[in-house]
Design a protein with these regions (language model features):
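Active-site loop/turn elements of alpha/beta-hydrolase fold enzymes
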Residues: 40, 91, 114
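Phosphate-binding/catalytic loops
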Residues: 94-141
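An anion/phosphate-binding loop that grips the pyrophosphate of nucleotide cofactors and donors
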Residues: 83
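A conserved, positively charged/aromatic
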Residues: 80
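Short glycine-rich anion-binding loops that position phosphate/pyrophosphate groups of nucleotides
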Residues: 12, 91-94
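Conserved active-site segments centered on acidic
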Residues: 1-77
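Generic alpha-helical propensity signal that fires on short helical segments
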Residues: 22, 30, 51-53, 93, ...
């Protein structure tokens, strides 16, 4: 089984959406892969559950999230050695955070370009994220 880790800043919006989307698509397309998600700076956020715009978009896509009520998780609190691929949602935002985290220095990390709110509306960023996740699932199929 292939394991993917999606990473964003607070683990409440982009990475959680990507995780739920990926797992749903893999299940419906019978792809032997699974995803989880974590954040690089979860302590900066008071709201620590999945962000409402992500839940709304998942509902629109008829995806029932499996972890919507779970708190966000910091990347240093999980064993990232079990993942075959680590994807940070926005290279411009996350590369400096990764570079400053000694825990992550030895890992090959891929960077996407899914920009966070308020710079980019969720109505733009989440469909873009869905497309990137769909492309990834197709590559694994």
């Amino acid at each position: 089984m292939i394991r993917i880790l999606f990473v964003c800043t607070g683990n409440i919006f982009r990475s959680r959406f990507a995780e739920e989307d990926f797992n749903h698509l893999c299940k419906t397309k019978n792809v032997n892969a699974t995803a989880f998600s974590a954040g690089l700076q979860v302590g900066k956020y008071r709201q620590r559950k999945m962000y409402k715009p992500a839940l709304i978009e998942l509902k629109r896509l008829e995806i029932i999230p499996s972890r919507s009520d779970e708190d966000s998780i910091h990347i240093n609190d999980i064993d990232i050695n079990i993942y075959d691929q680590i994807i940070c949602m926005d290279g411009q935002e996350h590369k400096p955070m990764v570079d400053s985290n000694q825990f992550l220095s030895s890992y090959a990390i891929q960077y996407w370009d899914i920009v966070d709110m308020p710079k980019v509306s969720s109505q733009i960023s989440l469909p873009k994220c869905y497309k990137k996740v769909d492309e990834l699932v197709k590559q694994l199929h």
